[in-house]
A protein has these predicted regions:
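C-terminal accessory regions
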Residues: 97-164
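Helicase P-loop NTPase motor core
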Residues: 1-61, 67, 120
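Short, contiguous strand/loop micro-motifs
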Residues: 38, 70, 112-114
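Long, contiguous C-terminal modules that act as interaction/assembly or targeting platforms
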Residues: 52, 56-64, 78-79, 83-84, ...
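Prokaryotic Sec-type signal peptides and long signal-anchor helices
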Residues: 23-26, 93, 160
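Alpha-helix capping/helix-boundary segments
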Residues: 46-47, 83, 144-145
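A short acidic (Asp/Glu
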Residues: 49-53, 89, 149-152
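Conserved helicase core region in the C-terminal RecA-like lobe
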Residues: 63-101, 125-132, 138-142
């Protein structure tokens, strides 16, 4: 894509939740992108149903990528980074890219070698998710951004929700 990805510093988790809903509504209101052309990818599969519920509570229908079979549907597609592999959407939003979750912290009983392997896999899955948009990538965090974002700041246009 020719557009530089957006990194949105929402400052706290509640504002991040609000921004996600506002941004999806604004994207659809532009008339250029429908709900079905938006993917929201999360680090963990266990977070997907909560995100679909949160969007639904605000009138935005979501479809779990585990149930998506490629049939067009006017719903935001929501899934894990891992499930995003091989799919493309006009707009991809990666919320909750926080320290300790992307990648996860090293477990107390986890060897350095095991952690290095887990971290490598997490970085790879994050990279896959970041390469799914055709037109625009939006990455958000509420507080305490992931070290991966800090390492890649130059690749993003960094903004706050109020800038958009």
């Amino acid at each position: 894509t020719g557009v530089k990805p957006l990194l949105v510093d929402c400052r706290d988790d509640e504002r991040e939740n609000e921004f996600l809903v506002e941004r999806i509504r604004a994207i659809v209101a532009s008339g250029e992108v429908g709900l079905g052309d938006i993917g929201v990818f999360l680090p963990f599969a266990r977070s997907v149903s909560g995100m679909i519920k949160r969007l639904g509570d605000h009138g935005i229908p979501g479809l779990n990528l585990e149930k998506y079979e490629g049939v067009p549907a006017d719903k935001v597609k929501v899934g894990s980074y891992k499930r995003a592999k091989g799919l493309e959407f006009k707009v991809v939003i990666l919320p909750r890219v926080k320290a300790g979750s992307v990648p996860k912290k090293q477990g107390k009983n986890q060897s350095d070698e095991e952690y290095a392997e887990q971290r490598g896999l997490a970085v790879n899955e994050f990279y896959v998710a970041m390469t799914r948009p055709r037109d625009q990538l939006i990455v958000t965090f509420g507080s305490d951004p992931s070290e991966l974002l800090l390492e890649a700041m130059d690749a993003f246009d960094t903004v706050t929700p109020e800038d958009l």
